[in-house]
Every structure is written in structure tokens, then in C-alpha cells.
């Protein structure tokens, strides 16, 4: 919430936020120094909360009971009905907002001319990138999903299953948690200051799709890493010992054991990265070029230009794409994974 950028920019009006100040200083006034100062102020609360959470987690870890039995609560029909109604009201309110946006994207001129049209989806007379920006987002999301999932899985596997010095292991574990405490705006500014220097050999990456993919993977690295680490920890170490006894290579063990057993987590991580890559704004707003404009950035640009309905139409495209990917993931998990993951049921 503290570092949110998209919502305050669209509906915040004159109510100022630190995230908006960063954007105004860098994009509006080209004042990189002041933008960096505000970014540090924006970073401090997140770092303090992150450190506090780590201290509390270590403190509570000493009192964990590892041999616990699941608690089965007594059935309370009245309470269940009340909670179901409450959840239904909240879900209905969210769906109503989404339905309004979907309906508005098909209306000729809201709320004056309510005739239906597809003209807003042509993006022919609006700035922001149009369909090119949408396909850039899909391409960037696919690249981030493939390379990000592969990289994160390799790092998690090397950290958990291969012998390494305790210092290196602790350093990697601390490093992968760092993006969770760093706001996307701060990451974006850091990328500008580093990659935009002409003397930097990596300057060729600035303004390309590659830097957008890298920033997206780094920004959303922590949650997938923790997910895959937890999946790897569920695999018994005895399987490694058995494979070593049989003379099986590490590559074959990875291909025949780790990859199939971690496949559900890999699918979850892939969907997580894809959806977040489709909707990312905070870091990408500083890194895109006219050739690599993204759909989420195009929504902000269209809204700034007064093309609100076109911005809504682009938002619906992003939402639809994410929902389709999630639906494919759900069907794949339901149909195929049920057969490939029978070992989990037999182990209980």
C-alpha cells in the first residue's frame, strides 16, 4: 500500500502520495537527485517492517511444534451462513466494479450514449501504444515467466540440495528476501541510475525488453523462491541418498525426481510471475521506451490524456489475459496433475 503507484495516480486526484512525488520529480521535472531522496524515504518504512518481521519470525520459530495434529473445529451452521453472506457481499462488490468497467468499455460514450460498440478496443485515435503495448506486455510476461521460473528453481535447488558454505547459503537466503522489502519505484530508479550511464557497458540494455524482463524477475523474485524452496524441502533427502547409492547422476535425479515432484509449485510460480508481469507499473514506468511500451503503462498514459474509456478497455484486456492464463492453469492442474501427483496421495 505504501509504495502503490497506479491507483493513487488514477483516482488520487489532488491527494499527494510519496510514490507520485517520485514519478513527478523524475518524469515531470527530470530531477533525479530529488527523486532518489524521496525513494530512500519510501524505502525506509518497508525496510523497518521487513526487519521487524524477520526478528519476530526467528523468535517464534523457537516455539514451533513440529509434531502437531490438525485441529478439526466443531460445525457451527449459523456462523458459517453469516460468514458466507459476508464473503458473498465482499465478492459481489468487487465483481460489480469489474462488471462496470467491462460494460463501460463497450459503451459508445458513457453515460450519454449507451449504445454498444467495439471502437474503444481499436486504440486507433489514442496515445499510449495500443495493441502494440498489449502484445509487448504478453511477450514480456512470457519471457519473465520462462526465464524467471527457470532461474528461481535453479537457485532454490542449489541452495537447498547442494553442499555450500553456511555463509554463502545464508547470504543467498538473505539476498533473495531483499526484493520483498524494496519498492518497485526504488528498483526502477536504481536501474535508471545504473544502466543509463554512457560509460557503463550494460547501457545497451537500457530501453530494451531485456531490462524490463530483468526488473520484473527481480521485483517479484521472493515469493516464487519461497514457494519453490518449500516444495523442495518436502522431497525426502533419502531419495538423494538412494540415487547416489545406485550411481545415478545429479542431472538424472533432477530430471526424474525433482522436476516431476516440484511441478505443481513450478506451475503456480509461472502463473504468479505471468500475472504480475502483465500488471506491473512501478518499475516499468521508468524503464520503457516508445518501442517497449507496456499495457499497464499505456493505461496510465491514456488516462492522463483523457482517454478514460480506452484505458478501461486496455485494463479489460489485461484482466482477460490473466484470467485465461489462470483458467488454463486450473484446468491443467485438475486434469493432468491429478495423474502425475498420485505419489502424494499414496504417501499419506
Residue ranges and their predicted role:
Residues 2-6, 52, 96-99, 103-106, ...:
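Membrane-embedded alpha-helices of multi-pass transport/permease systems
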Residues 1-3, 85-95, 178, 182, ...:
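Transmembrane alpha-helices
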Residues 2, 8-43, 47, 79, ...:
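Interhelical loop and adjacent transmembrane-helix boundary motif
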Residues 8-13, 67-73, 107, 111, ...:
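Membrane-interfacial helix termini and adjacent extracytoplasmic/periplasmic loops
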Residues 89-165, 175:
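Phosphate-binding active sites in nucleotide-utilizing proteins
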Residues 43-50, 71-100, 170-176:
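N-terminal signal-anchor/first transmembrane alpha helix
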Residues 75-84, 154-191, 348:
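Cytoplasmic-entry segments and transmembrane alpha-helices of multi-pass inner-membrane transporters
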Residues 36-77, 156-163, 229-240, 244, ...:
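C-terminal transmembrane helix and the adjacent membrane-cytosol boundary/short C-terminal tail
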Amino acid at each position: 500500500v505504501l509504495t502503490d503507484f497506479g491507483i493513487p495516480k488514477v483516482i488520487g486526484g489532488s491527494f499527494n502520495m510519496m510514490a507520485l512525488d517520485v514519478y513527478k520529480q523524475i518524469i515531470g521535472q527530470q530531477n533525479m537527485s530529488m527523486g532518489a531522496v524521496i525513494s530512500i524515504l519510501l524505502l525506509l518504512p518497508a525496510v523497518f517492517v521487513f526487519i521487524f518481521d524477520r526478528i519476530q519470525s526467528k523468535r517464534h520459530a523457537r516455539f514451533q511444534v513440529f509434531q502437531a495434529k490438525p485441529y478439526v473445529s466443531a460445525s457451527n451452521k449459523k456462523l458459517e451462513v453469516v460468514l458466507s453472506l459476508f464473503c458473498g457481499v465482499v465478492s459481489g462488490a468487487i465483481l460489480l466494479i469489474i462488471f462496470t468497467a467491462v460494460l463501460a468499455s463497450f459503451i459508445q460514450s458513457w453515460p450519454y450514449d449507451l449504445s454498444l460498440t467495439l471502437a474503444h478496443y481499436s486504440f486507433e485515435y489514442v496515445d499510449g501504444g495500443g495493441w502494440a503495448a498489449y502484445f509487448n506486455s504478453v511477450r514480456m510476461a512470457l519471457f519473465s515467466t520462462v526465464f524467471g521460473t527457470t532461474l528461481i528453481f535453479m537457485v532454490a535447488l542449489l541452495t537447498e540440495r547442494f553442499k555450500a558454505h553456511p555463509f554463502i547459503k545464508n547470504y543467498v537466503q538473505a539476498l533473495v528476501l531483499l526484493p520483498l522489502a524494496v519498492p518497485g519505484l526504488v528498483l526502477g530508479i536504481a536501474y535508471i541510475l545504473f544502466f543509463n550511464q554512457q560509460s557503463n557497458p550494460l547501457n545497451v540494455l537500457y530501453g530494451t525488453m531485456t531490462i524490463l524482463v530483468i526488473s520484473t524477475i527481480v521485483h517479484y523474485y521472493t515469493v516464487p523462491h519461497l514457494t519453490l524452496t518449500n516444495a523442495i524441502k518436502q522431497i525426502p533427502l533419502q531419495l538423494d541418498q538412494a540415487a547416489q547409492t545406485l550411481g545415478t547422476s545429479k542431472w538424472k535425479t533432477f530430471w526424474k525426481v525433482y522436476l516431476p515432484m516440484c511441478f505443481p509449485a513450478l506451475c503456480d510460480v509461472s502463473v504468479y510471475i505471468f500475472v504480475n508481469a502483465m500488471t506491473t507499473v512501478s518499475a516499468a514506468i521508468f524503464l520503457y521506451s516508445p518501442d517497449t511500451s507496456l499495457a499497464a503503462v499505456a493505461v496510465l498514459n491514456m488516462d492522463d490524456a483523457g482517454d478514460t474509456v480506452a484505458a478501461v478497455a486496455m485494463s479489460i484486456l489485461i484482466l482477460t489475459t490473466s484470467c485465461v492464463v489462470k483458467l488454463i492453469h486450473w484446468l491443467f492442474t485438475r486434469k493432468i496433475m491429478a495423474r502425475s501427483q498420485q505419489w502424494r496421495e499414496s504417501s499419506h
